[in-house]
Every structure is written in C-alpha cells, then in structure tokens.
C-alpha cells in the first residue's frame, strides 16, 4: 500500500533534522540527546507505556532554569515547522488526492451545468456573488510577523526543491537556504516583548494582503474565468469581484480602550497608503510593458496623438500615486498637508477610468492578449481592494451609544434616556431622526468616554463610503440600539447611508433577533433609510460561552431561519454576517462545510464571515493557499445559493430542539451552577498567566473584577485548549446525545447525521474536538495544580468527556474518532509527541510560578514558550 503521507513525513523529517543540527551547533550534543530522549519517551508514553511517562516526567522536572527556555523553544519550533510542512503539503505536487481535493469550483460547475441548473442562472449567480471576508486581529495569532515571513520563505525553499529538474548544485543552494532560515528562526525571540498596539495589528493584516492576497486575487479570477470559459464559452466581467475584504483591525473598539478615533484615522490612512504603494508597483511594471503605439481614437485624443499613448497615461498615474503616497506620509507624520485635489488619487474612478481606457484601446487594436495580462490583473485588484485596500468596520458596545444619548438628554433637561422604556426610547429617537434641527448643542462639554464615541461617529461620517464597511453594534437586543447609532451618525453629519448592523450574541438575544428586526422593519422611517437592504450579525463566540456549542448552534440556525423569513416578507435583501472564531467552541471549522450547513435560503449569493487570528495565516498566508481558500468560499456560496440543503424534517427539528434544551442544562449545571467551577478553571488552566502573554491589544476581560461571564470568549477557549480538556467545545453536547440515544432516538440521530448537513457538521466538529482532547493530560494538570478538594470536579468533567466520545462513536458506528477523515487524524497524530512534553512542562512551570513569590525570568519565558508551542500544535488557539 502506498503511504499517502510519505512526502509530508519526509518534509517534517527534513525540517526536524535541520532544526536538530541547528540546536546542536548552538548548544551541544548532550542537550540535543536529551530533547530526543524526551521525544521518544513521549511517543512511548502515548502508546500506554507508564514507565516511559514516569521517566519523561522525571527528566522534565530535572531541567535546570538555564535549560528551560531552549527546551521549550525546541519543541515549539518543531511544531511550527510541522505546521509549515503540512501547509506546504496541501499545495505540493506530491499532495495525495484525499488531502488535496480537486478544484471545488471546477467540480461544482460540472455538477451544476451537467445537471438541471440553467447556464444563465449559474452565470448570473457567479457575477453577483458578494462574499466579504472580514479580517480580525483576535489575539490568537501567537506567531510574530518577523517569524511568519521566515516561515513563508521556508515554504518557498520546499517548493523549489520539488523541481525534479534541479542540478545538484541548485539542490545544495536550496538546502543551504533552508538551513539558514531555520537558524534565523531558532535565534529569533518568539515571544513579543510587548503587546501589539491596534495599529500593529492593522499592519499585520496589511502584510498578509501584500504577501499573499494581492497576488492571489488576480490568480484566482484568471483561474475562475478559464473554468467558466471552458464550460460556457463566456468571459467573466473585467470588474468581477466575488470576494472582497474588510477588517476590524483598528476599528473594533468593543472592550478595547486602546482603539480610539485617532487610531482608527491612522489605520484608514495606512490602508490607503498600502494600496497606493502596491498600485504604484503595478503601474511601474505597466510602463515597461505597454510600450506599443497603436491606439483607438479615444486614447489618441486623450494623449494628443502621442507616440507612446499608453505610457503617457501610465506616467500620469505614476505621478499621482507618488503624490498620494507623499500626502499620506505627511498625514501619518501628524502634519496637515496642503494639496491640490487634482494631483492625487481621491476616488476609485481616478485610477480605474484611465486604465479601462487603455484596456479598451488594446482590445480595439487586436491586442487582447496584452490587455488580459498585468493590466487586467490591476483592474481586478481595483475591483476587489479599491483605493482603500480594506473596508474598515467599526464595532462598539450598544451600551456606549445609550450612554451618549442619556448624557445628552440629561444635559438638555429632557429627562434621563437611561431610565426610559423601549417604547419611549424609540419615540424619542425617531422624532430626533426626523427633526431638521440638530440635537447636539455646539457648546456641549461631554464626558471623556462619551466624547470618544461622538468623535468616532464624526470620523465615520467624514470618510468616503468605500473606506468604511459596517457599523457593528455588539450586545444588541432592541430596536433602539440600532436607532441610537443612526441618530449619532445623523448628528455628526454623515452624508450617505451606512450599514448599521446589530450583533446578536447571547442565547436570549439570538432567540429574540427576529422580533427585534421585525419591529425595525415595521418603522417607515427605518425602511426608507435602509432602502430594502439589511445586514445582521450572528455571534458565535459569546453564544457558545453562554449556552454551550450544541444549544448555541441551534439558536444560530433558528435565528437565521426566522430572519430570512421576516426579511422576505418585508421584501428586504438580507445579508447575514457570521462572527465565527478559529475554534469549534467559537463557531470555527472548515468554512466550506459551515456555509453548506446554513439554513436553506440564508446565503442567497451573499455572506460576510470573520476570519480570525491565526486562521488568516493558515488560509491566506501563501498565494496558492489563498487561491484554494477563495475557490472554496466561492463554490460553497454558489452551492448554498443554487443547490441549497434540504429543509429539516419536523421530527429532526423536534429532536434538535430537545438536544439543545438538554445540552444547555448540562452545560450550565457546570459552568454556572457548580460553585467550585471558577476556582477549578483558574487553577487547572493557565488562564491567569495568559493575561501576561503579549498577544493582542485587547484586555482579556470586559470587566477587571468579573468572573466567567466577563471573560472574553478567546481566553476562555484558549485556556481550556492549553490543558487539553477543550471543555467549551463539547460540554453539554455529549450528554444530550447520550440521553437521546437512551430514549430510543439513535436511528433518528443517524438519519439526521446522514441527510442533514447542519447536524452532520455539528457531529464532525465534535469528533475533531474529542480527538484533540487528552483527559490524561488534563488530569496531570489537575494533580499538579488543583487543590485536592476540587478534584471531584475534574473527575466529573472527564466522565462527561468519555460519555460524549461514546455517544459520537455510537452515532457514527465508527471504530475510532475521525476514521472518515484520515488526513485530520494524521495531522493530530503527527504533532502529539511534540505537544505532550510541552504540556507536561507547562504544568510543572505553572506549579513552580504559583509556589514562588518571584519566578526567574527564564521560568516565565519558558512558560510563555510552552503556551505558544501548545497553541501551534493545536492549530486553533482561541
């Protein structure tokens, strides 16, 4: 039998060997031998050898302070290199067909056009696709940008080494480059010295676009055009943009006091600066390429019959782009530059129109081959990225807007908005929205917090429409939450409609979402404002933390169904914005699968989805990977639109509702009602220590003095993934499945898993989480860190985990977890011998730091490295 993963293992082995050689050179043979000994003991321990486990623990506890950091670093870097090898394997020539599926768009077009779907319908759907991927800087991207660039260079070398035509000398050069890169990685500090600022996070997002997506977008569209042309003999429009990008980096101020209006302005300027700089590079290349003389009448008239008409136009654009960059540099340095608006690029049309004129002229002169090269690529980049690169969303908590209006009504002697009921609030807001006089007096001195909200609205109001995305209201629950934002935007002079998007996050708010939107749709003023277009955001992270994954998933599904129904009834075009995380406990998982498991009718050619933290790098970090991801999104949205999943049968709904009800009871019985739970959580996980890790710019808690409910979803998930119990991603689900099976519903569950994509996805995600959970490791954390009087809770949690595993295996009738997804299983098994020692060392270091009043710098750094290493190994941190 051919080993499907031979090339993957070979690359992992090569990178691991080079890392070992690097460590030997830096330290010595003895230290490398100790690392190898621990790795082999970890493998034996995982196969059930208790003696090996004890020997490994003895070795780990005997590490000196000086050995801690290089040891943690070695295992951490091996896991990062394993991730690189796996990432490369999916784009490698040697990738097995079970890992690298055929192009999903190609397959889908074949199914659709070979089936019952009319060609015109397929083309119409494709041309109107509106997929908006929203990049967010959640603090799950552990790796520093410096290292990420080196990891990309490693993949470049692996790609080069796949070329079978290389000479021996060329092979040696590429191997030398690999050794140099891995040495650079080894000698670079992995842990940031300080937390990134919101501007740093935004720059990280821009670097992903520059390094990968800038090339991937035209590559993907060229591939898509070719596929469509081969099957339909039709060319896609020049300005087609099925996928666009937005960002929360520098715009998401929910619970982040460091994101101010000043920061948001700087990020907007940086976005525009990056776009201008990259377009300038394209134009410089085009000046060299478009040296031809033949032109149509329009272009010749524009250039006064110049001998180099194309170059004349491009030189003018080059001059304007350089002036635009100079202008933005001045702004970023804090100056107020004085410029002639005609000298710089202000609008998308300033860039697009001259290039379209060149494109048309080339085609008219029989030079379509040239027109469809770099010039077409640039036009398609403009259609995707505009001149602002990313549309920036603003997110703010609903309470902050209410505070502004309450302070204002008190100042004006109109009463206290905070004490009014919903009906009174709506009446007041609608009256002011319809009023021709301003509400905010010129001499009003607002408190600092209120002033910051007003400044943000003023900034949003001053921006061009294409620079901004949506204004998202977190913790929205009532129509007044939306109307309050609209009033503030009106008062700050916003000249154009902005998408104001309620985010429904908790279980109660999800269940009430359709009532809230129905009430808004019933308001004539509001319907006039929206012009029949509405966006609603569904929160995954907080609903799962509130109710557990099973109940949250069903609440999200039913909320979407109801929102679709009321929007159709009101003749409103609804876009659903999915606030998914990278992990299962925050709604993560394969995007293709997730989109196809949405309720029928809920996608309808358009969707917004957050792309979080490290998942941005895993999906879009390399141009080839990004092309794959773009194809997956495109095919999934087309399929969900034209071949929607079936409506769930009444008995499936009834069963799912019962599962949700029982799972939320089981989940909350532990998280809310178990008096020792918070104490156990804080002791058994590195939750407290995570606060010291300089990951993201946002504080880990909404309130410093709060408990679990105030903890953000990301550190909540991150902490449980560190001790390998993965609790938020399964608690409550297995208990509900077992209860359903015991009351005779097993056959019904199996029918649902086979025929209902929504339920199949839920079970698939549970399987993956159960496979990653390690009860023996979590027990070791408990023994090392948790007071003995709390151990009963750990026993109960591990029993619940075992119940869930049994329930899923009974449902799927499989002998082992992930039996049907061998690639995922291989991925987990490849990493375990390297993650396990880091986990054991982490528990040891946590015990040490908690015992000692002041830990050494080495102990603290080693602890941070174990946290980063486990995160790299688990591949989905928060």
Curated annotation (Swiss-Prot):
EC number: 4.1.1.31
Function according to Swiss-Prot or TrEMBL: Forms oxaloacetate, a four-carbon dicarboxylic acid source for the tricarboxylic acid cycle.
Active site as annotated: 138, 545
GO molecular function: magnesium ion binding; phosphoenolpyruvate carboxylase activity
Keywords: Carbon dioxide fixation, Lyase, Magnesium
Superkingdom of origin organism: Bacteria
The protein's name in its UniProt record: Phosphoenolpyruvate carboxylase
The organism of origin for this protein: Shewanella pealeana (strain ATCC 700345 / ANG-SQ1)
GO biological process: carbon fixation; oxaloacetate metabolic process; tricarboxylic acid cycle
Enzyme superclass (EC): lyase
PROSITE patterns linked to this entry: PEPCASE_1, PEPCASE_2
């Amino acid at each position: 039998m051919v080993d499907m993963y031979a090339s993957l293992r070979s690359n992992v082995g090569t990178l691991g060997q080079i890392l070992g050689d690097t460590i030997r050179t830096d330290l010595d043979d003895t230290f490398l031998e100790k690392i190898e000994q621990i790795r082999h003991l970890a493998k034996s321990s995982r196969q059930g050898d208790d003696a090996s486990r004890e020997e490994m623990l003895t070795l780990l506890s005997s590490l000196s302070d000086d050995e801690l950091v290089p040891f943690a670093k070695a295992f951490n870097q091996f896991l990062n290199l394993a991730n690189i090898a796996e990432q490369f394997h999916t784009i490698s020539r040697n990738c097995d067909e079970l890992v690298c599926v055929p192009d999903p768009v190609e397959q889908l077009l074949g199914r659709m056009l070979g089936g019952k779907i009319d060609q015109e319908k397929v083309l119409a759907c494709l041309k109107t696709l509106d997929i908006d991927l929203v990049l967010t800087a959640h603090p799950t991207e552990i790796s520093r940008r410096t290292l990420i660039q080196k990891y990309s260079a490693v993949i470049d070398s692996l790609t080069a080494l796949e070329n079978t035509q290389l000479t021996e000398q060329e092979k040696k050069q590429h191997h030398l480059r690999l050794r140099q890169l891995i040495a650079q990685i080894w000698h670079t500090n992995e842990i940031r010295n300080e937390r990134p600022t919101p501007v740093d996070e935004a720059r990280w997002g821009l670097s992903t676009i520059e390094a990968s997506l800038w090339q991937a977008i035209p590559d993907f569209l060229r591939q898509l055009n070719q596929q469509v042309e081969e099957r339909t003999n039709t060319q896609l429009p020049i300005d087609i943009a099925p996928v666009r990008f937005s960002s929360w980096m520098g715009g998401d101020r929910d619970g982040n006091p460091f994101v101010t209006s000043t920061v948001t302005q700087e990020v907007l300027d940086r976005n525009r600066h990056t776009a201008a700089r990259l377009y300038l590079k394209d134009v410089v290349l085009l000046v060299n390429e478009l040296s031809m003389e033949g032109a149509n009448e329009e272009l010749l008239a524009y250039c006064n019959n110049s001998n180099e008409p194309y170059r004349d136009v491009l030189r003018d654009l080059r001059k304007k782009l350089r002036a635009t960059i100079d202008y933005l540099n001045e702004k970023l340095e804090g100056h107020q530059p004085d410029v002639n608006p005609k000298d710089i690029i202000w609008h998308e049309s300033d860039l697009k129109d001259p290039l379209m004129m060149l494109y048309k002229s080339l085609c008219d002169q029989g030079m379509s081959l040239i027109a469809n090269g770099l010039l077409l690529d640039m036009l398609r980049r403009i259609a995707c990225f505009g001149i602002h690169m990313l549309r920036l969303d603003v997110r703010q908590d609903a309470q902050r807007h209410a505070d502004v209006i309450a302070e204002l009504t008190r100042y004006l002697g109109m009463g206290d908005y905070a004490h009014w009921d919903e009906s009174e609030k709506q009446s007041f807001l609608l009256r002011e929205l319809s009023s021709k006089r301003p509400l905010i007096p010129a001499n009003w001195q607002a408190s600092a917090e209120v002033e910051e909200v007003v400044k943000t609205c003023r900034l949003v109001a001053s921006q061009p429409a294409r620079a901004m995305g949506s204004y998202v209201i977190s913790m929205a629950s009532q129509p007044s939450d939306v109307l309050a934002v609209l009033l503030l935007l009106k008062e700050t002079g916003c000249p154009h409609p902005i998408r104001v998007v309620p985010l429904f996050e908790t279980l109660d708010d999800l269940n009430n979402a359709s009532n809230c939107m129905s009430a808004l749709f019933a308001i004539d003023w509001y319907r006039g404002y929206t012009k029949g277009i509405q966006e609603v955001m569904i929160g995954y992270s907080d609903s799962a933390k509130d109710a557990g994954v099973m109940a949250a998933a069903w609440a999200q599904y039913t909320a979407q169904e109801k929102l679709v129904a009321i929007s159709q009834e009101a003749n409103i075009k609804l876009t659903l914005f999915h606030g998914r995380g990278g992990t299962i406990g925050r709604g993560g998982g394969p995007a293709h699968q997730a989109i196809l498991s949405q309720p029928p009718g809920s996608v309808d050619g358009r969707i917004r989805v957050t792309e979080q933290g490290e998942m941005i790098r895993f999906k879009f970090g390399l141009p080839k990977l990004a092309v794959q991801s773009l194809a997956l999104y495109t095919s999934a949205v087309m399929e969900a639109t034209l071949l929607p999943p079936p409506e769930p049968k009444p008995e499936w709904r009834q069963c799912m509702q019962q599962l949700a009800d029982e799972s939320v009871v089981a989940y909350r019985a532990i998280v809310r009602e178990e008096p020792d739970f918070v104490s156990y959580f804080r002791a058994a996980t590195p939750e407290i220590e995570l606060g010291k890790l300089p990951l993201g710019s946002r504080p880990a808690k909404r309130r410093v003095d709060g408990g679990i409910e105030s903890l953000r979803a990301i550190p909540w998930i991150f902490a449980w993934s560190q001790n390998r119990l993965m609790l938020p991603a399964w608690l409550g689900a297995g208990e509900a499945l077992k209860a359903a099976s015991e009351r005779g519903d097993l056959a019904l569950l199996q029918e649902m898993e086979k025929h209902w994509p929504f339920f199949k996805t839920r079970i698939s995600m549970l399987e993956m989480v159960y496979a990653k959970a390690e009860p023996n490791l979590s027990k070791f954390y408990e023994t090392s860190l948790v007071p003995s009087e709390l151990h009963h809770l750990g026993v109960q949690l591990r029993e619940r985990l075992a119940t869930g595993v049994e329930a899923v295996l009974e449902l799927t009738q499989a002998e082992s977890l992930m039996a049907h997804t061998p690639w995922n299983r291989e991925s987990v098994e490849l990493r375990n011998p390297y993650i396990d020692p880091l986990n054991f060392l982490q528990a040891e270091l946590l015990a040490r730091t908690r015992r000692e009043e002041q830990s050494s710098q080495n102990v603290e750094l080693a602890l941070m490295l174990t946290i980063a290493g486990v995160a790299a190994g688990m591949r989905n941190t928060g």
